[in-house]
Amino acid sequence: MIVDKQSDSAISKRKFRTGEVMLDIKKIFSLMGILALAFLICGVLELSASPRKHIIVIDPAHGGQDAGVKLTGKVYEKDITLAVALTLRKELAKESNLEIILTRDSDKEVSLEDRRKNIAKIKPDFVLSLHTNAGFGKSASGFELYCPEFNKDFKKDKKTAKGDVRQEKNKYLNDSVRSARSIQENLNTLFPRKGRGLRRADLPITEDLFVPAVFVEMGFATNPEDKNKLLSPDTQTEIANALAKSIKSFYR
């Protein structure tokens, strides 16, 4: 029997090349798997490395039947606080590291108790409560700022040491004061010599809650000059921008 050595050689080469192709395909799939895994790991690492968003609660006082102080026949405190809050939310929403939540975003009545419950549920990093002032005669004018006293004991479990509670309380108070001072500085620029100081008080909105907070009285509805400013959409925007500047700088 005559063996065709040339044919055998050709067949061997075909088999070898086929093996090479199969090997190359396996390598390609292996590399694809490694790359896919690498992309997945990078995505997870990037996600885990993303900065946590700071939750800011803006509380426009009053709403609905609870109108607050009357400025004109048709405009009340509830309207001013909501207008400033909506503008402030729009400005702060530009910051990727902030999440903004309003206690109300329309002319609806939300009880103080419900506001506190919502804040307790949200557990924000900061609460800003907006109001307009009144009283003390027509001569009283300017803005006022308040920080929580945090006088009441923390509602902690028995395992929490008193030293830890005191340290946490001091942090909340310090953050509140620092935020208030920044707001005071920016509002002073807007309303020169109109600041009535920074005070500490038990704030209704944060009663039994321990969270950094500032209570802002934006001006006196009973003062003609203050009232005209509060009624001005331009001034409302300026107030919102001043507040936004303070919050941005604190949570930068």
Where are these regions (language model features)?
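Sec/Tat signal peptide C-region and signal peptidase I cleavage site
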Residues: 45-48
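Short, Lys/Arg-enriched N-terminal segments with co-localized hydrophobic residues
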Residues: 8-21
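Bacterial N-terminal signal peptides that target proteins for export
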Residues: 15, 23-34
